[in-house]
Regions:
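TPR/TPR-like (Sel1-like) alpha-helical repeat modules
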Residues: 18-29, 168-173
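Hydrophobic face of amphipathic alpha-helices that form TPR/SEL1-like repeat modules
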Residues: 2-9, 30, 44-53, 57, ...
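Glutamine-centric residue-chemistry signal
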Residues: 19, 25, 44, 74, ...
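Short helix-capping/linker turns of helical repeat alpha-solenoids
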Residues: 9-11, 16, 30-33, 37-40, ...
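Hydrophobic/aromatic packing residues within the alpha-helices of TPR/SEL1-like helical repeat arrays
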Residues: 24, 31-32, 68, 102, ...
Length: 173
């Protein structure tokens, strides 16, 4: 997998998309074989990523969701976030379960999940709108250097429509 990325990105070698694709296909086959024996959450997450993006295999969000759900149930925070996000974005899973997976990942400190959940509460998507909770989540995410969350905080504090206007906080974020 790492060799495929090196060929794809031209790191330590000349960029060669054909070689990269061949190595990604080998990696996918290897991960698939290993996962069948081990049921390792990291392999399941990686297989889900590869299926979601079509890297080394055909793009298949249904299969990606399957692997992510297996990994999520084993406690893989990245899979919890990826599964919840996929279900919310393409409308294929139970929206309440999607929010529950993102919440679980956010509570485990995943900055991307905190940002995504902040948007869910800001916009009232499948949950009651709660700006206080949204700001709390955006802040947790921004404190982990998530630039998107920092931008949202800056916008919210500058506008002062849903939270008290605070120009200093807007500038800080």
């Amino acid at each position: 997998y790492e060799l495929a990325k090196m060929y794809r990105d031209g790191i330590g070698t000349q960029r060669d998309i054909g070689q990269a694709e061949a190595h990604f296909q080998n990696a996918f086959s290897g991960f698939f074989s290993l996962e069948a024996d081990s049921h390792d959450d990291k392999l399941q997450y990686r297989l889900g990523q590869m299926l979601h993006t079509g890297t080394g295999t055909g793009k298949d969000d249904t299969a990606a969701a399957h692997y992510w759900e297996c990994a999520a149930r084993l406690g893989n925070v990245n899979a919890q976030y990826a599964l919840g996000k996929l279900w919310l974005e393409n409308g294929t899973g139970d929206p309440e379960q999607a929010v529950a997976w993102i919440t679980k990942a956010a509570e485990s400190g995943n900055a991307a999940a905190q940002y995504a959940l902040g948007k869910v509460y800001r916009d009232g998507i499948h949950v009651p709108r709660d700006m206080e909770k949204a700001v709390e989540l955006f802040t947790q995410s921004a404190e982990q250097d998530n630039e998107y969350a920092a931008y949202q905080l800056g916008k919210l504090y500058l506008a002062g429509e849903d939270i008290p206007k605070d120009v200093e906080a807007a500038i800080r974020w």
